[in-house]
Amino acid sequence: MERMLELLQGHVDYIILGILTLMSIILMWKIIERILFYKQLNVTSYETIQELEIDLTRNLTTISTIGANAPYVGLLGTVLGILLTFYHLGHSGGEIDAASIMVHLSLALKATAAGILVAIPAMMFYSGFNRKVEENKLKWQAIEVRKAKQ
């Protein structure tokens, strides 16, 4: 356990923030793809609502998964940061410096903040895209009703 903590000591921030950065890049890629898709969408080109729904909801699971899990990745970074703070405190030889502890704890919390920073826009876009899915399905159904009446 001690060897693992020493190994993590200088790398926790890079690992956690690297994972969150990767999640952010994937998130932006999926968001941009969805925006471009919804802009060019023509619901009349679909024969069934199931085909439409498949295309409308593509990549939404990824966006939702990132939004739901980014805070946990950040929380993992915070827990590891606090664990390392206590590890250093235990190996300090009884010399407790409150200022140093506070600095380490505040730095540990940045991982949670970063996770939340990734999650909030992800969930906002996910909700907005879900509304677009419903609107486009309703448009398709309205067109089908008009066709049936003719």
UniProtKB/Swiss-Prot annotation:
Membrane topology according to the record: Multi-pass membrane protein
GO cellular component: plasma membrane
Principal cellular location given in the protein's record: membrane
Localization in the cell: Cell inner membrane
Positions of transmembrane segments: 12-32, 66-86, 105-125
Protein's GO biological process: protein import; transmembrane transport
InterPro entries hit by this protein: ExbB/TolQ_transport (IPR050790), MotA_ExbB_proton_chnl (IPR002898), TonB_ExbB_2 (IPR014172)
Pfam families (UniProt xref): MotA_ExbB
Keyword vocabulary terms for this entry: Cell inner membrane, Cell membrane, Membrane, Protein transport, Transmembrane, Transmembrane helix, Transport
Domain of life assignment: Bacteria
Database matches in PANTHER family: BIOPOLYMER TRANSPORT PROTEIN EXBB (PTHR30625:SF15), PROTEIN TOLQ (PTHR30625)
Protein role: Involved in the TonB-dependent energy-dependent transport of various receptor-bound substrates. Protects ExbD from proteolytic degradation and functionally stabilizes TonB.
Similarity section: Belongs to the ExbB/TolQ family.
Quaternary context: The accessory proteins ExbB and ExbD seem to form a complex with TonB.
Official protein name in the record: Biopolymer transport protein ExbB
Species the sequence originates in: Haemophilus ducreyi (strain 35000HP / ATCC 700724)
